[in-house]
Design a protein with these regions (language model features):
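Bacterial N-terminal signal peptides
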Residues: 5-15
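A general, composition-driven signal for non-globular sequence regions
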Residues: 10-11, 52, 100, 251
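Bacterial Sec-dependent signal peptides at the C-terminal "C-region" and cleavage site
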Residues: 15-22, 355
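Active-site-adjacent loops and short helices of periplasmic peptidoglycan-processing enzymes
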Residues: 20-173, 180-186, 198
Length: 381
């Protein structure tokens, strides 16, 4: 592993990553606040402990639905059948959050998606699961497979609704990452999350995320509640052009859920600022190439590399570029070959992938011989 140490001459600062805990405390049992763009964690409280997801599990249901649409196996206009299981388990007779779907009717996928988001319809979630996979259990297996692909390594799903099951557990960190995944991967569907209400079967229901109506930039994502888990929410907000994603869970009431969510995102928007570290296509460092037409290759970010910093800090940042090297040709432009690790003091606070700025073809015999002699004499510095 090669490590290239460098000091970022940015004349800016990054406080110790524990700054958030010193300046803010949430009453939620579990909480996390992330910068959507960089994934920087601005605040966390027991974010890696297992918790019951309640209806926030429906975000994973939506991820599978959107993935099926993206792969051509489902369309928003497809009509799905309302089975007796969906009607009894998630419908009006269940006593839980429901779309009030009629037994034996068919409903368009788009309406089911809107119901899952706005009304938290358990019947809508089950209809989607059965329509896609045949059974909810098979659909849950699809949820877990996609969750692992996304990188949600500490979560396990057993149903499409979030109804209580002792084997269904997630973490606040995984829910925040899931929210970021949905925003990043499926922006064409994001507008559903901010719809204020939905009417179905003659019954009008408001969006259960009350924060979308209070004028603080919240436009998603999903609330949840069970008697055992308490009240929780995955929140997304546009904070003056910077998007934040938050999770609060384990609260005692809807009012407390809304208040703790509002406090967390408002604090994050005021306490931190976005700073551009490297412009798009700017060379961050160079990586050695053994036996190539060129002895090194420039490393760039995937667009601009930005940092999310405490507002008003003025301490210097340090950074290191890490890669397994020397690299062997051919190296193709755009290959991910390194990562930029940003530190505050000695603590890692952000990681950004780095890519080859240009291609490097295999060199001739003389070039390989020269590199071999250099390696024998000096090693790769």
């Amino acid at each position: 592993m090669k490590r290239l140490g460098t000091i970022l001459a940015l004349l800016m600062a990054l406080a110790h990553p524990a700054w958030a805990q010193a300046d803010f405390d949430s009453q939620a049992k579990f909480a996390i606040l992330m910068d959507h763009e960089t994934g920087t964690v601005l605040y966390q409280k027991d974010a890696d402990l297992p918790m019951e997801p309640a209806s926030m599990a429906k975000l994973m249901t939506l991820a599978v639905v959107f993935n099926e649409i993206a792969n051509g196996r489902l369309a928003l206009t497809d009509e799905l059948y309302v089975s007796e299981n969906a009607w009894r388990t998630g419908g009006a007779a269940s006593g839980g959050s429901t779309m009030f779907a009629e037994l034996n009717s068919t409903i368009a996928v788009e309406d089911l998606v809107r119901s899952v988001i706005i009304q938290s319809g358990n019947d809508a979630a089950i209809v989607l699961a059965e329509g896609i996979a045949g059974t909810e259990a098979t659909f849950a297996a699809m949820m877990n497979e996609l969750a692992l692909d996304i990188g949600l390594t500490d979560s396990h799903f057993t149903n499409a609704t979030g109804l209580p099951d002792p084997e269904m557990l997630v973490t606040a960190r995984d829910l925040a990452d899931l929210g970021r995944y949905l925003i990043r991967t499926y922006p064409q569907y994001y507008h559903y999350f901010s719809e204020p209400e939905m009417e179905w079967n003659g019954i009008n229901q408001p969006n259960r995320n009350s924060l979308i109506e209070v004028g603080i930039g919240v436009d998603g994502l999903k609330t949840g509640h069970t008697e055992t888990a308490g009240y929780g929410s995955v929140i997304s907000t546009d904070a003056g052009g910077r998007r934040l994603v938050a999770v609060v869970h384990g609260l005692a009431s809807m009012r407390e859920r809304a208040e703790e969510g509002r406090k967390l995102i408002t604090w994050g928007a005021r306490a931190f600022e976005r700073v551009a570290a490297y412009a798009d296509n700017a060379i961050v460092a160079y990586a050695d190439v053994f036996g190539g037409e060129s002895g090194s290759v420039g490393l760039v970010g995937n667009g601009e590399i930005a940092l999310y910093l405490p507002r008003g800090s003025r301490r210097c940042l340090s950074a290191e570029v890490h890669y397994v090297g020397p690299l062997m040709p051919p190296v193709m432009a755009g290959d991910q070959i390194a990562e930029l690790q940003v530190f505050c003091d000695d603590r890692l606070v952000q990681v950004a992938p780095l890519y080859a700025a240009q291609s490097v073809a295999e060199g001739g015999i003389m070039r390989k011989a020269t590199d071999a002699l250099r390696q024998l004499a000096l090693g790769w510095l």
